């Protein structure tokens, strides 16, 4: 039987930050379905997220997510972890591919300084950065004028390209712990990102696009979802632009994933 792939964004897609008792039956239903199809239907599951592996595992533990996807691509899919012997192990092979070209914080800070001076704006680090990072992320607070925001961010993206760096941005989601009225600014190596991770998995398992379904909720999911034949935006998404571009799930969060994964597996088994 041919392998199939199921790909999930994490925050506010696979994981609901405000999970409550009413959500637990749907969470258990989703878990049971994923366990069954992984064991019986040649299905590979993976999380593609901007969060760190530590953050993902902490949140999964918080709501007792006992099912473990085979792969987690953290830090905007610049790191790959595989479930093996009851723990997630980082892939050195993937790490070497990601860092095949120079990726330096000093270069990124210089890029930001140039655009910051030009537009008289500020880019704020989201955390304390360590050595040899594969993701450098910043916040940019909205000017109150969406058109002006996009002009500044597109300028930053284009200038980054002239410096041989990849920068993406998306509107922040306060439900996922982000600040209000802000944008995520993400710098990753060229060999990284959710689309890159998707193609790596397709090649690794020999899965064609028509046998993949992907779920997301925000702008940083657009590239990989646009690439797939079966792509879903969560109905609980706060991103109206993304909801207008993709098919929306019938239900939010766990119930939505359960419903559409089951439909996808049953359709492919016909």
Swiss-Prot record:
It holds the Pfam family S6PP. This is Uncharacterized hydrolase SE_0147. GO terms for molecular function: magnesium ion binding; phosphatase activity. The keyword NADP does not apply. It comes from Staphylococcus epidermidis (strain ATCC 12228 / FDA PCI 1200). Keywords: Hydrolase. Belongs to the HAD-like hydrolase superfamily. It comes from the Bacteria. The keyword Oxidoreductase does not apply. Its EC number is 3.-.-.-. One of its GO terms (cellular component) is cytosol. InterPro entries: HAD-like_sf (IPR036412), HAD-SF_hydro_IIB (IPR006379), HAD_sf (IPR023214), SPP-like_dom (IPR006380). It is an enzyme of class 3 (hydrolase).
